[in-house]
Design a protein with these regions (language model features):
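N-terminal cap/lid segment of alpha/beta-hydrolase-fold proteins
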Residues: 2-39
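Catalytic active-site module of serine/aspartate enzymes centered on a nucleophile-bearing elbow/loop
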Residues: 263, 267-306
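Alpha/beta-hydrolase active-site loop
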Residues: 95-116
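Short beta-strand/loop motif that positions the catalytic acidic residue
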Residues: 230, 236-238
Length: 306
């Protein structure tokens, strides 16, 4: 499924003694995905793929990935098809979708992780969509565990005002109009990551307007999935100031994973001396500087499997 090629020069992080290098991963759709490998100096027993949120480039996770590598974990970050350096055509011509991200991109990345770190235990850290789409991965059983951050159904009706009004405008007005006029959705204009391929944006809109997110597509555009088979342990982190992944929406997504043993932690940033974490700031080095216990939760979870 994957054909991995080194595409950049190796460099060693001065502070961490972490070898960081670029990788190109070919999916079974014959699409090239840009990726970065973080390799610690010692032998790797545990390796992690960081699956990104919708429209978020892999560089966003650099500090977090470096931190994990400093703690001895092998790490691989990547751009989904149509995002960042994995956009290889005019965006209006890109036919990527949320389904293709989960069914083709993420499995290819997991295969590449195994190629890079042989004889390790493999884990997935999912941010928002990166955790939602695991049930589309045919090789999900290679994962020993999952650590999800801000992962929920994103159901609009469960959001509080005024954020719900913003979400309704984005989903129900901007996406269909922009897709029709431009052939893609300029989500960056709303401060929501990179511009999105129209298929990604269209499915995002459809799924956030129904219960269970991806469950709304079962027996419609999705006829094969593994949500009722996945049984590896998972820790899901959420934060009380997250307008999207509120507690109700987290539970809505958790219910889709019918056999996954999930530990849910819904946390108040103020309990950690942090003013705000929301949907994105867990991965910020500034958050880690103020609340190191939060990143340590990921390390502790991953260590359980060693």
């Amino acid at each position: 499924m994957t054909d991995s090629h080194l595409t950049g020069q190796n460099n060693t992080d001065d502070a961490a003694n972490v070898d960081t290098y670029s990788l190109t991963i070919m999916t079974d759709r014959n699409q090239a995905l840009a990726a970065t490998v973080y390799r610690p100096s010692d032998a790797v027993k545990t390796a992690i793929m960081i699956a990104p949120a919708t429209g978020i480039k892999r560089q966003f996770y650099h500090n977090f990935a470096t931190y994990l590598a400093e703690h001895g974990f092998g790490v691989l970050t990547f751009d989904n098809e149509g995002i960042g350096e994995s956009l290889t055509t005019d965006l209006a011509k890109c036919d990527a979708s949320l389904i293709s991200w989960g069914r083709h991109d993420m499995p290819a990345v997991l295969d590449a992780l195994q190629d890079e770190f042989a004889d390790a235990a493999y884990h997935l850290i999912g941010h928002s969509a990166g955790g939602q789409l695991i049930g589309l991965m045919p090789n999900y059983n290679m994962l020993a565990s999952v650590f999800n951050v801000a992962c929920s159904s994103g159901q609009i009706k469960n959001m509080a005002m005024p954020y719900r009004a913003k979400a309704m405008f984005f989903m129900d007005a901007l996406i269909p109009i922009a897709n029709l006029a431009l052939g893609y959705t300029p989500s960056d204009k709303m401060g929501m990551g990179e511009p999105l391929p129209r298929g990604v944006a269209r499915q995002w809109r459809e799924w956030c307007n129904g219960a269970g997110y991806i469950k709304t597509a079962f027996d419609k555009s999705i006829h094969t999935h593994f949500y009722d088979e996945i049984s590896m342990p998972a820790l899901w982190l959420g934060f009380s100031d997250d307008d999207i992944a509120n507690s109700e929406n987290m539970d809505d997504m958790i219910r889709v994973f019918t056999r996954m043993p999930i530990e849910k932690r819904f946390l108040d940033p103020k309990d950690f001396g942090v003013r705000s974490i929301g949907h994105m700031r867990y991965f910020s080095s500034k958050t880690n500087a103020k609340a190191p216990a939060l990143w340590q939760m990921a390390v502790d979870w991953l260590r359980k499997g060693e």
